[in-house]
Amino acid sequence: MHKDSKIYIAGHNGTLGRALLVALKESGFRNIILKDRKELDLVNQDMVQDFFAREKPEYVFLCAAKLDTLGLFTPADVIYQNSMLQANIIQSSYQNRVKKLIFYGSAWAYPQKAMNPIGEESLLSGKLDLKAVAYGLPKIIGTKMCEFYNRQYETNFITLYLANLYGETTEFDLQKAKVLPALLRKFHLAKLLRENKTNEILRDLKMNSLDQAQEYLQNFGVNENSVEIWGSGNTIREFIHAKDLADASIYVMQNIDFKDIASHNEPHLNVGSGEFLSIKELAFLIKDIVGFNGKVVFNDEKPDSTMDRMLDSSRLQNLGWKHKINLEQGIRIMYEWYLKA
């Protein structure tokens, strides 16, 4: 990419998209196309085709995706919208001779019983976790679209599979948030309760009374003395900061072509931090960072995930990229941002 290359970020309002936009601007790229959902419905094939024909982007970061806790609540919407929007963008990128595209897969698209840390060759080697099918299956389809378009049409579309993503602009709503931001907010609110900082609690929750706030937080196992976490806490996870993923994305866009990985079985790239820890270890790390002095209670009578998710990112590391932000540092950055926001 040159500094004046025409770059399109699909999904620029998401956690990754925002980090990419900042990273590209800081690197001097100035010809960046951004369209929100009101301006461009990515599920609508005609609109996407018209957009690509009119704008002629040279480089595409396909970050857009419908997220809903892996599609547990709206699986039909998740599988339909994600399948359509990625197919529309990949096809239009081919038709309009996009020089390079990066698509994003997910660790949840790997089989439920894949051996950890999971290598790229594990894709399609077994069944997905049933809870992850609505989100994971479109990711597999997008991955294979990129590979087969490359082989048939000589495009240069690369897929990156990411570990659990976190960052400053992630979702903190306790009903929707993923494990890391949910824990961060729970411990923060428990700390405020313990310190009797009523005004800060009400401002954070946008509520009018302490009784209302306490009743709401009790539903999520949060009080001034303890934070309850569902399950045993023994499940192992890996996390990558959005700034690191943005950095990896730009590195791949500038330095790695499909021909560099085409000979591999399953020619895509895992992107992870290589830091593996249990949910229990994560909880105590966040507890210490936030400064909550109460207890952590693991309720093993509640539903628990037994599926560890760790990625083998050695293929990308051997091609020259390594992460920069360790987990503790990343959580501290995230918490500082949350306090200011």
PLM segments and residue spans:
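C-terminal substrate-binding subdomain of Rossmann-fold SDR/epimerase-dehydratase oxidoreductases
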Residues: 11, 19-23, 189-341
